[in-house]
Structure formats: structure tokens, C-alpha cells
Amino acid sequence: MEQFRNIGIIGRLGSSQVLDTIRRLKKFLLDRHLHVILEDTIAEVLPGHGLQTSTRKLLGEVCDLVIVVGGDGSLLGAARALARHNIPVLGINRGNLGFLTDIRPDELEEKVAQVLDGHYLVENRFLLQAEVRRHHEAIGQGDALNDVVLHPGKSTRMIEFEIYIDGQFVCSQKADGLIVATPTGSTAYALSAGGPIMHPKLDAIVIVPMYPHTLSGRPIVVDGNSELKIVVSKDLQIYPQVSCDGQNHFTCAPGDTITVSKKPQKLRLIHPLDHNYYEVCRTKLGWGSRLGSRDD
């Protein structure tokens, strides 16, 4: 296992709890005589930190490991910036669900110490890359760890579009939108829209229609190496949007084409050795616990 010496820290802004956790993490890492680098935006709200700072983009070039303190949204943003550097990312949960940031603040020192001592699991999570084209010219590009979503934006009208997979026509749909999700994103927006839960090790993509205007509109799971093309109807009266992880947005026009495929670079997500995906689902989604013993 890799030994980490240069540790980057990214944190969610606007939370005193995040700042308190970062202070604890900083002290813990410095006590182990490690080189700690703060993302510049979080460094601005930590006066007197005395540490080297870096932009998020450059953290991937100077660090062996990046620790994200925040919720899943914080890790999504970090993943898109760091995946191309092949740098491992570890999450400490200061958000809500915490599917990706799975270390609790109360176990920070214990779990981070295990990782630093080489006792950890590595998961390679693939991202999606999306491109919006108008008259054969790219007008917007973005990456997503969770999902790429076509939606009506501020309008309440339905969208009509065609779906192609690897150049083959699949169907046309009239719906509130369309979600294209990775296995990582299958427990996010896609799940709320009725999509299946996919184990993160699966090499697959799920296509989930949002409130389709037909009883036959159902999610489709396709090979992870597929290229998806969504063609917005030329007769559409609104300008829908494409969102990547709900954080990057592009406005489409009638007739635009959205291409979605797997990004070559993957996120290296670090977990403690006792990480259990099904336990995470059971805890976060409220699944039933073990049946009690019976006196037969």
C-alpha cells in the first residue's frame, strides 16, 4: 500500500463544524510529522493556519492523498477536479447521508491513522463526461461522478427527446427529463426517480426517465463503455438544461445533442478496511436490520 506524506485538505465552506473538524485533522496530521496543504478557499477562513496553500487544481499535482471534509457534494466537486491526477481521495463526513464521505468525525483520528498506516481499501469509481453540441460544434462540456441530468430548468413544461446508444436508436420520450447515472450515482437522484441501486464495482450506466408521459418508460441499464446520445426535439418550445452532479449547468436549445460516455480517468476513493457497502446502504437508506432470534 502507498505511504502518504503530502496530505491535501479540502473543506466545505460555510460550516463551523467543518472548520472545527479541519482544525482537528490538521493537528493530527502535523503531530505525525506530515506535510499538510490546505485548499486556498478554506485557508482564507482559517486565519493563522501556518500551512502551505494551493488551488484545488494544483492539489492533485503536489499531494499523495487528499482528504475531503464535508458531505457527498463536497466530494463530488473534489472528484471532478482530482480524477485526472489519479490521486486517492478520503472523505470525512460533515454532511447528511455520507455515501462517499464515510468516516464519522468522532472516529477521525482512529480511521485516518489506519489509512496512513497502510490499512485501507481502494475503489476505482468511474466518472461520466458530457458534451453539448449545437450544429456540430461543442458549446459545453462537463464531468460527473454521480449523474448527468437533462431537465427543463425553470420551466414546468415537459421535454421531448430521442435516445441513441452506440449509434442505435432506442426510443423517443416525452418526460420531465432524463438522468444518466453511474453506479456511484445510482443511490442519488436516479434512486429518487425510481432507478435501481447498482453496486459501485459494476461497469454499467443507468438511464432513468423522470416522470415519463408513458407507462412503458422504465430505467435501462447499459454497458459502462456505451456512448449515449440524447437529441433534444427541434420543435421544443423551451430551452432545457444539462446538469453535471447538480453543480455544473449548460443551457440547451431545441435540436441540440448531448453525448454522454465514460471518462478515461477514474476517481481513486479510499475507505477504511471495515468499509461495507451493504452496511452503508442499510444505514443510510433505512433498510431492515437482522431478524431477532426466535424461541422455537
From Swiss-Prot:
Gene Ontology biological-process entries: NAD metabolic process; NADP biosynthetic process
Keywords annotated in UniProt: ATP-binding, Cytoplasm, Kinase, NAD, NADP, Nucleotide-binding, Transferase
Known catalytic reactions: NAD(+) + ATP = ADP + NADP(+) + H(+)
Any Gene Ontology CC annotation: cytoplasm
Listed GO MF terms: ATP binding; metal ion binding; NAD binding; NAD+ kinase activity
Active site: 72
Cofactor: a divalent metal cation
Principal localisation: cytoplasm
Keyword ATP-binding set for record: yes
Signal peptide: none
Membrane-spanning residues: none
UniProt-annotated location(s): Cytoplasm
Documented EC number(s): 2.7.1.23
Domain of life: Bacteria
Binding-site residues for NAD(+), renumbered to this chain: 72-73, 146-147, 157, 174, 176, 187-192, 247
Entry similarity comment: Belongs to the NAD kinase family.
HAMAP family xrefs: NAD_kinase
Function, as annotated: Involved in the regulation of the intracellular balance of NAD and NADP, and is a key enzyme in the biosynthesis of NADP. Catalyzes specifically the phosphorylation on 2'-hydroxyl of the adenosine moiety of NAD to yield NADP.
Name of the protein in its database record: NAD kinase
